[in-house]
């Protein structure tokens, strides 16, 4: 399956703080791609670089095979976005808020406003002032705004933030509808494990600005992921090993976390020993929740 979005070796630092540290991943056309990590992991920074809101220090971002051009509105219109807790004019109606966006665009058919409001089940409330909307309604209005330019890809940053369980379920249903009926690829950022598990077919896990895992959700859940804790100071050796073999990893208190196949654990240990990297614990993690917690704690 062809990729719609490719991110390669992305870096972003603020003074001495590495917000994003050498992140690479790809999103296939038609995916609902989960972006999972704790608060402060670097999720929002990465997504804002893709959207052109933040300039990366280095790295490559490609959309449909072409390098991004943030000065090109045609490129920007290919990506819709719901930024966490979208802001609207509270004293204006939903329709009036979207009409402002329409007036600043090159869109030629004003019926698009009713179309996107209907898509998010707000058409019958389009004349109501946004100040009276619930948080869930505001989130849906944000998605309507993201759909205005009929993008091929939408990025949703914490779309279920602040919603009750029913609101979260409604949001998942809406995202699935957009993905299947409009054939829009979705990147969804969340720290809610169940949200990613229930809706995404592929995902990335990041922590402290680094990628620690990527793959199909069911494979990450069913595969055996191991925790490696070294007993020597050969940190550089194991990091170089992981990079050479393209194994995502993170380093926490002299422990290294990476994903590996159960049937090949002995093969991995022998290979590491051949590099003079001694191990004194190999622990298997079974569930997505346990996997996530051990990767990010």
Positions of PLM-derived features:
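Generic beta-strand hydrophobic packing signal
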Residues: 10, 23, 280-282
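C-terminal coupling/interaction segments
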Residues: 260-297
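Positions that flank functional sites
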Residues: 132, 257, 287
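ABC transporter nucleotide-binding domain
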Residues: 172-259
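ABC transporter nucleotide-binding domains
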Residues: 5, 12-188, 193-201, 205-207, ...
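Primarily ABC-family ATPase nucleotide-binding module
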Residues: 1-3
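Generic alpha-helical secondary structure
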Residues: 72, 235, 262-265
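Surface-exposed charge patches
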Residues: 100, 115, 240, 270, ...
């Amino acid at each position: 399956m062809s990729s719609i979005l490719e991110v390669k070796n992305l870096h972003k630092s603020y003074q001495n703080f590495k917000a994003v540290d050498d992140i690479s991943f790809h999103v296939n056309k038609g995916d609902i791609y989960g972006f999972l990590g704790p608060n402060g992991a670097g999720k929002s920074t990465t997504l804002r670089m893709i959207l052109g809101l933040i300039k990366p220090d280095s790295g490559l971002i490609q959309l449909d095979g072409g390098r991004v051009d943030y000065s090109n509105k045609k490129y920007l219109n290919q990506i819709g976005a719901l930024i966490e807790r979208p802001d609207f004019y509270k004293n204006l109606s939903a329709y009036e808020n979207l009409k402002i966006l329409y007036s600043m665009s090159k869109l030629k058919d004003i019926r698009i406003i009713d179309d996107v409001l209907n898509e998010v089940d707000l058409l019958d409330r389009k004349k109501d002032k946004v100040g009276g909307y619930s948080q869930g309604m505001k989130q849906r209005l944000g998605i309507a705004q993201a759909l205005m330019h009929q993008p091929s890809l939408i990025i949703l940053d914490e779309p279920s933030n602040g919603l009750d369980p029913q609101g979260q379920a409604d949001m998942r249903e809406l995202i699935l509808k957009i993905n299947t009926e409009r054939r829009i690829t979705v990147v969804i950022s969340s720290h809610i494990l169940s949200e990613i598990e229930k809706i995404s077919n592929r995902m990335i896990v990041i922590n402290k600005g680094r990628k620690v895992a990527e793959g199909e959700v069911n494979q990450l859940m069913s595969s055996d992921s191991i925790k490696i804790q070294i007993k020597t100071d050969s940190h550089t050796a194991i990091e170089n090993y992981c990079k050479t073999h393209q194994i995502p990893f993170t380093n926490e208190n002299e422990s290294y976390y990476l994903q590996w196949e159960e049937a090949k654990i002995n093969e991995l240990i022998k290979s590491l020993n051949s590099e003079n990297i001694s191990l004194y614990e190999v622990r298997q993690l079974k569930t997505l929740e346990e996997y996530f917690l051990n990767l990010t704690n």
